[in-house]
Amino acid sequence: MSYRELVVELAREHAEALSDALLELGALSVSVEDADADTPDEQPLFGEPGLTPERTAWTHSRVIALLAPEHEPAVLLAAAANELGLADTPSFSVRAVEEQDWVRLTQSQFDPIPIGERIWVVPSWHDAPDPDALVLELDPGLAFGTGSHPTTRLCMEWLEQSVQKDQSVLDYGCGSGILAILAKKCGANPVFGIDIDPQAVESARHNSERNRAEITYGLPADCPAGEFDIVVANILSNPLKLMASMLSSKVKPGGRIALSGILARQAEEVASVYRQWIDIAVWREHEGWVCLAGTRRESN
């Protein structure tokens, strides 16, 4: 008998509670998605650290629970509904999950990614398509940043055009370390990467070792004193605004800064905060996201 997926469609107010109940009753994993995805009624949800999203689930939600062979879907759902005090057990469907080589399947979903004029981000199980290119070997992982997201791509394109040999670079919110590694491969020295997540710091260190890139990583308390030729921060608009004074102070007079993780509609709001110290504007937009870039004024 194979693993199965229990699929339940229900109203938003019950989706999270049902997910928790199914996990407590033995579901191996549970996900919630928009039951109206890919239709005119699809509802995108957005949120940022420090802010409460306007909606925490979709009006018409779909709960998908992965069950081990020994669990009977109908019995498990009835128990969950009873635990929540629902008058009736929600309607449901069951899908068989085929046995697969999950490692091979996952790897097949990640191909080398070309970025900018000469950058390739290449998973370890692939060969570089162009041996003469600027190659970053990076596997998908828990830390954000493999080059597939528009904000990472924008920052990489900016670094490729901006970094000069022996310039100092600070990557604040380094995630996987991809931007710091690229800066190093473009000739920057020294390069520092900072992140609030210790797991991201360890991931970045591992990725730098794999790419033979000498970079110093740490938590915010480890951020070196002094100023840098280049500061790059790919985070989100709210923390970027909160850290504007600190990040601007890390840029040398005449030095440059690039910021991303910013939706196009948020660009002017973020830029206006930085204009106290930085001459800054939208450098490029891609798929609704922007990269802001600017130069610190000599007088600040």
UniProtKB/Swiss-Prot annotation:
One of its GO terms (molecular function) is protein-lysine N-methyltransferase activity. PANTHER family: ELECTRON TRANSFER FLAVOPROTEIN BETA SUBUNIT LYSINE METHYLTRANSFERASE (PTHR43648:SF1). The gene is prmA. It is an enzyme of class 2 (transferase). It is found in: Cytoplasm. It comes from the Bacteria. This is Ribosomal protein L11 methyltransferase. It catalyses: L-lysyl-[protein] + 3 S-adenosyl-L-methionine = N(6),N(6),N(6)-trimethyl-L-lysyl-[protein] + 3 S-adenosyl-L-homocysteine + 3 H(+). Its EC number is 2.1.1.-. Signal peptide: none annotated. Its main location: cytoplasm. It holds the Pfam family PrmA. S-adenosyl-L-methionine binds at residues 152, 173, 195, 234. One of its GO terms (cellular component) is cytosol. Transmembrane segments: none annotated. Methylates ribosomal protein L11.
